Amino acid sequence: MRAFLFASVAVLQVAFTDVVGACSLPQPAGKVILTVTGHIGACSDQREVRLDRAMIHSLPLTEVRTKNPWERGRATYQGVLLRDLLHYVKAHGKMVELSALNDFHTEISIADTKKYNILLAFRRNGVELTVRDKGPFFVVFPFSDVRKLETEERFAQSIWQVNHIEVK
């Protein structure tokens, strides 16, 4: 009987470790500024990944210098490539739906995130983006580097005030 109980506890321990171990991302220590849900393989809360500013800044950062319809001239944006964020959360799907604080939504194919350097920007010209100025995140396409991206469809996908991404 004692051996059976010991074996049962050991099996439960392994099963519990597998479930907890699957959630390899840390919990946010600060204010959550981005939530990723949907078809993801990593988790901090079983169904979603919640990220604070420090977690975002710990990912590989990239700069994109480009022009867009909302700025005069070129601006330098710093942030995380959307494909790097999707890799971080182990996304597996075909599309991402990005949502803004004002409930505006747009979709971008995951194939496009792999093909183009689509940036989830949190800084413009060295200054953190605030909610008043398109923050916390602004989707920036490399319009100056890839001229064929200068379309109404891509302009509509250049969503700002992003706070949620759902992988579909």
Predicted segments — roles?
Residues 6-15:
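Bacterial N-terminal signal peptides
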Residues 21-168:
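N-terminal intrinsically disordered, low-complexity segments enriched in P/E/S/T
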Residues 1-4:
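Positively charged n-region of N-terminal signal peptides that target proteins for export
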